[in-house]
Design a protein with these regions (language model features):
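Membrane-embedded, lumen/periplasm-facing catalytic core of multi-pass transferases
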Residues: 155, 347-413, 419-420
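Signature aromatic-anchored transmembrane alpha helix within multi-pass, membrane-resident enzymes
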Residues: 18-22, 165, 207-211, 265-271, ...
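Membrane-lumen/periplasm interface segments of specific transmembrane helices
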Residues: 28, 201-273, 302-309, 313, ...
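Short helix- or helix-capping micro-motifs
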Residues: 22-26, 118-129, 149, 153, ...
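Specific aromatic-rich, kink-prone transmembrane helix
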Residues: 104, 124-127, 143-162, 166, ...
Length: 528
């Protein structure tokens, strides 16, 4: 397809595109809408919205104060208040943001290259595992990415002040969204050659407008809490401990992989590199178009800014932090295929298929459950375990770790009807199991689960493992069988799904709990 051909999508406005894209996204995510909340959703984002809805506090009271701006929590609180405290309500609300983001991706790509590349880019972005999963999760990263992509589109259209409004909304969704305006300000100041030096300074100053609402939020947070950022533990984990040159170097390597290789993105990166060896395809109207080089350089600068910022800051190397950059990578890749491959639709379709496969098949390296549909396995296993506890352990104190501690104490998260008394450990490593055994008299039941996905590395390096443990929280959970032997307990419920597992151990002598467990799942039954 060439851009000289008439395409009905050339005339589609935002008002016509957004409902169409939202309906498609909704249908793709329909099987996931009723899942209870997962990991950081349960640990912060939903409780923060709960606090805002019930105590009208912009700063979280009943959960960790991360210092994040309040727009994302306010958005969720609005939908919860209007439609009720149900996970499906939040997921549909997030799909609206995903549809908004994808609509801006389409309009941006159509303006820069044409409708054919716009369709390919939008479809590939929608099914790219990391973006797909985040589309229905309540993390602030999706809202920040949606407004950031809107701002980038308006910026490339020359609509300077509307773009700053979009970036301001992005910054009020999550403070790290300031990365893109800073990158564009740097572009205007150092690399944009049109206009005088004074003109470049003025444009750079305009690009820095989103700093103002961020400063206002930080001032409010300081006035309210006495801190500019989140609580001491959160700040230490995400900033103080991260400021290490060796950690930065190691994180930069992993961040580069996350952006250009993770979750089958390597296929598109390789295809893009291979296509560069071919000359541009020439038709009756000349060479096929490409994204203008200055715009590509702006995109590269935005990508580089994300890589550097999230290598320097942030305790966990979560791929969702790079969410605004992924559509830019995909757009450049699809544009390159379109420009240099005659029948470019075939490799573009292959990339989409490869991304879809990444949703269902785990990669042969370590990854987070939220990078593909493994998170669904995690949630479903935890839901089954919570229901077992409700049926058979109502009067017991439970030993477990986060996020199960929130799942079992906050009924609005969708796991339990009433809270359980808990004893908390950090994880289920050998060290924590020793602590658990020392606290043996304080609990009757242990609820264990996989806190990390342990995939055997391609090349085993003890030094690399030590560095991962030191800087990135890597650890190995003991198996349910080892934990049962160590804690002198009996496994009364055990379920697995690929790399994820949950186990419930009864600490007392054989009792009615063990006998009723046999009716529920069989003695030491494994549910696949």
């Amino acid at each position: 397809m060439t851009t000289s051909q008439t395409n009905p999508l050339d005339e589609f406005s935002f008002r016509r595109l957004f409902p169409l894209i939202f309906v498609i996204v909704f249908l793709l995510h329909a099987p996931l809408l009723r899942l209870p909340f997962f990991w950081d959703e349960a640990g912060f984002y939903v409780p923060a919205a709960y606090d805002l809805a019930h105590s009208h506090s912009l700063i979280a009271k009943t959960t960790l104060d991360t210092g994040h701006p309040p727009l994302s929590a306010a958005y969720l609180a609005f939908w919860f208040t209007v439609s009720g405290w149900n996970p499906a309500v939040a997921r549909v609300a997030m799909l609206l943001l995903a549809g908004f983001a994808l609509t801006n991706v389409f309009l941006l790509a159509r303006r820069l290259v044409g409708s054919g590349v716009a369709v390919a880019t939008t479809v590939a972005t929608a099914v790219f595992p990391i973006f797909f999963v985040q589309s229905s999760l309540t993390h602030a990263d999706l809202m920040a990415a949606a407004f950031t992509l809107w701002g980038i589109r308006l910026y490339t259209e020359g609509r300077v002040w509307p773009s700053q409004l979009a970036f301001c909304l992005a910054v009020l969704s999550k403070e790290t969204a300031i990365i893109t305006p800073l990158a564009l300000a740097l572009w205007e100041l150092l690399f944009h050659r049109n206009g005088s030096g004074r003109g470049r300074i003025e444009k750079a100053a305009i690009a820095l407008v989103p700093v103002l609402p961020l400063l206002a939020w930080l001032a409010y947070h300081y006035h309210t809490t006495g801190r500019f950022f989140g609580n001491a533990d959160f700040y230490q984990y995400n900033v103080t401990q991260a400021l290490n040159p060796l950690r930065f170097f190691l994180a930069l390597i992993q961040r580069t992989w996350h952006l250009f290789g993770a979750m089958n993105m390597l296929a598109l990166t390789a295809a893009t590199a291979a296509a560069m060896f071919f000359p541009p395809v020439t038709g009756s109207s000349g060479e096929r178009p490409r994204i203008a080089v200055p715009v590509q350089l702006q995109f590269v600068l935005v990508m580089l800014a994300h890589l550097l910022a999230f290598s320097l800051l942030g305790g966990a190397l979560l791929t969702r932090y790079l969410l605004p950059a992924y559509p830019l990578v995909i757009m450049i890749g699809m544009s390159t295929l379109h420009r240099r491959i005659s029948r470019w639709e075939w490799p573009a379709a292959l990339m989409v298929i490869v991304f879809v496969l990444g949703l269902f098949f785990d990669p042969p390296y370590r990854f987070a459950p939220e990078d593909n549909l493994t998170y669904k396995d995690f949630v479903e296993l935890h839901f089954k375990a919570a229901k077992f506890l409700e049926q058979h352990e109502q009067n017991s104190t439970i030993l477990t770790a986060w996020p199960a501690t929130d799942e079992l104490t906050r009924p609005y998260l969708g796991y339990v009807a009433q809270s359980f008394p808990l004893v908390q450990v950090q994880d289920f490593t050998v060290e924590q199991m020793i602590k658990a055994r020392q606290m043996r008299s304080k609990y009757q039941v242990a609820y264990l689960f996989s806190t990390k996905i342990d995939v055997p590395p391609w090349i085993r390096s003890e030094r690399w493992e030590k560095l991962n443990r030191r800087f990135f929280g890597s650890h190995v959970d003991v198996s349910p069988e080892v934990a049962a032997e160590f804690l002198h307990g009996k496994i009364v419920f055990l379920a697995r799904s690929k790399a994820e597992w949950v186990a419930i151990l009864e600490m007392d002598q054989p009792s009615s709990v063990a006998s009723t467990a046999q009716k529920f799942c069989g003695p030491q039954k494994t549910a696949d």
